[in-house]
Amino acid sequence: MPNKAVSIYYLNFNQTGTCISMGTSNGFLIFNCAPFGKFYSEDSGGYGIVEMLFSTSLLALVGIGDQPMLSPRRLRIINTKKHSIICEVTFPTKILSVKMNRSRIVVVLKEQIYIYDINNMRLLHTIEIAPNPEGLVALSCNTDTNLLAYPSPPKVISSDINPNVNTNTINIARSKSEELIANSKDNNLQNKFGTTLEGQQNIDEDKAANGYQVDQNTDTAENDINSGDVIIYDMSTLQPLMVIEAHKGEIAALNFSFDGSLIATASEKGTIIRVFSTSSGAKLYQFRRGTYPTKIYSLSFSQDNRFLSVTCSSKTVHIFKLTKTGEERTSGGADDADSDDSGNENDGDNNSVGNGDVSSLLSDNDIESTREPYVDASRKTMGRMIRNSSQKLSRRAAKTLGQLFPIKVTSILEPSRHFASLKLPTDSNISGNVKTLCSIGNEMEVDKVEYPELFDGQDQGDRTKVTMLPIRVISSEGYLYNYVLDPERGGDCLLLSQYSTAIDQ
């Protein structure tokens, strides 16, 4: 009999983008990115979550339910080096997401977030949240910041850190979502390590509803609620820090920078990407991905916070450059005129727009660069050539007008463009809806002899190497794509290599 086709249920990079974890209908696999190769696999049933802790031997596994021992409600922590199970914890409902850093493990259910101490798997906190069917959360890799982010206001935060310590009920003003009012309440949440979690707190729905400040007219109050709020939560003190009004629509993707100082967000519409400071909550950057709605799959910063990559359902990866402006902008949240829910965006697909003073964001080197952005010959179409020419004229006009008008006006005049992009070499007719994730690596040197297309007539001198930025993309088809980006020129990313995970196990 022919072997049954293997399905991919989970695919992700580790925190540094150096390894890939994969869950399939047959088992799970771990790959090294450079050099590419499989270094661990286990054929023991279907897995829906396979999360790594950096490049350590610690793995968090959740099954798909095809076997009694692989329930989607059971979290299993294993040590791949010792081939041992560290612990197992069963939850009341299906596990949607698991995130780890060196001090915390976060387990996300549809309406709860469980926070554990990674050193002893002691339950520290349980956060009751509004329904989060996608299990969308972000956890900072850096334990110095140690932040958690999740969409929508929470109902109740309960804890059993110490038996005599009361925890907080958070009341959020839905109109602006800025005031966090703490009311003490004793919670008796019981946790038995390695067994089913019992005694979960019964939520008083009436009190939870009264925790929100609403108008007498319920319908009007509900219509005024922004569903794109993001809670920033301190994982060290186990207290909420702030509410960021990121978007008017529901959050589709969010992620922290490596140091935890920035957080990027995208709404379900997928046209606007925003970057906020996690210390002040201020919006620092705003990028426009394009006109047409699309599903955003991932947001990823470079480790030096210079670049932000965005993957989406169009199989295009956009890379935006976060230009340092010398001082932090303090523009508002989702109520700006260029909101992603306004419905009047008419720039072309694969475009971006920054937010703030044009003269500060666009330097002379950006406008009159002596080295034009690299253009991939396979993507050189008449439409792209016309659009690039138009963007150059727009940038010059915006720079001139930006010196005459205030910031609010110049942010509208600012040109729409991304810094770099790439298009995956997949057959759209066959691939269908391919999910992609991206990771930006550290700068490396590329030899001229191996890649002469990176050196054109505009380059001066006898250079034999050029500094490039590696861009890694993995797809739900089971492929790893290695691209490089010129961090000074931008433009199209160049495909260096492509590998298949060959999930025949």
Swiss-Prot record:
Q: Which residues cross the membrane?
A: none
Annotated WD repeat ranges = 246-286, 291-330
Compositional bias of type Basic and acidic residues: which residue ranges?
A: 368-379
Origin: domain of life: Eukaryota
SUPFAM superfamilies recorded:
WD40 repeat-like (SSF50978)
Q: Its topology with respect to the membrane? A: Peripheral membrane protein
| Listed GO biological process terms | cytoplasm to vacuole targeting by the Cvt pathway; late endosome to vacuole transport; pexophagy; piecemeal microautophagy of the nucleus; positive regulation of vacuole organization; vacuolar protein processing
**For bias kind Low complexity, which ranges apply?**
349-360
Main subcellular location of this protein, as a coarse class: membrane
Q: Where is the composition biased (Acidic residues)?
A: 335-348
Q: What family does the Swiss-Prot or TrEMBL record give for this protein?
A: Belongs to the WD repeat PROPPIN family.
Q: What is this protein called?
A: Autophagy-related protein 18
Query: What would be the name of the gene that encodes this protein?
Result: ATG18
